[in-house]
Amino acid sequence: MADINIENFYRHIAVALSILYANFPTKFALYVDEVAGIDEPDEYGLHSPRYTSGFFALLWLEEEGYIRYADTIHQDGVDQACLTHKAFLKLSAISEPIYAEPSVVDDAKVVRLTPTQNLSPSVIEERKLVINQMRMALRSGSSLAVNKVVRHILYDTL
């Protein structure tokens, strides 16, 4: 099991990239609330560690060349955010399934993956887009799926 901070980091990365891709090429303010969830500061004005890590995940994405932005909005987000060329190409690339939930064949075997033979080639290709695999991983709620897709994006070179 991965450390919870790493799992949160991967989820923050996935959500941020998904939001930015959906708005590409528009530049807009991306708030930590959208990435890490709504959080109210405590009586000292400090946010939760999860919220803070969401903010620093956005900064990390910029430092590593996946996004660009004009400025930070306190510790609440980044202004004029947009995907970089590198991130856009990685997210719009076609990839064999990065992670697929196995389906149950019978009680003894859990080996068969979701079939694709009855789908049209265009639907299969659309499902193979990295961004769509990431969206499916986020919808599934599976930390393992999100982690695998984000690692594929971060570690795979063009």
Identify the residue ranges that each predicted region occupies:
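Short acidic, glycine/proline-enriched loop segments that cap or flank alpha-helices
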Residues: 4, 46-49, 71-79
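A short, conserved structural fragment
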Residues: 59-75
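Short, cationic, amphipathic peptide segments
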Residues: 106-158
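Short, amphipathic alpha-helical interaction segments positioned at domain boundaries
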Residues: 79-122
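Generic structural signal for hydrophobic core residues of well-folded globular domains
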Residues: 20-24, 61, 90-94, 157
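Short amphipathic alpha-helical interface segments
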Residues: 2-45, 52
